[in-house]
Amino acid sequence: MQSALTNTVQIADILEWVLSQVGTSEVWQTSFSISEEFLRRLYHITRSGSTSAIHLILDYKATNKTKQLWVFIEKVITTTHLTDNHSKVLLVESVKGDKVSIITSQNLTRGNRNESYIITTDSKVFDKLKAEVLDLMNNQSVPLSDILTQVLY
């Protein structure tokens, strides 16, 4: 387990580091909001082949501020869901079976503030968090693609 309270490491840095350690992985992320800068980082991560899929859960309220990113999100992220969410969880499951859980205070945005994180490879923690994230996705949220379809058509 690793942990820190720092203003020098961003969650995108942690994701890239974890992927460099475990190889190609499926990723689940929850956050209140996302910024264009962070989305660009995810774009480059996906283009590098480090991820097989990225699943994202964002808060309804915060997405009103990022409507201009919706089309970009749909091009970069495999699935995006909107719900009442303030959690910041990052789950990485490699094709080799590695399981990494990161709990952080940072939204998927860039800031110069102190943020905290805890990284663990405990499979029980991962499995519990993944089940809870999947429940949010499957039972408590609306896919962004459904909203885009309604808005565009």
Model regions and ranges:
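PLD/PLD-like phosphodiesterase catalytic module centered on the HKD motif
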Residues: 1-153
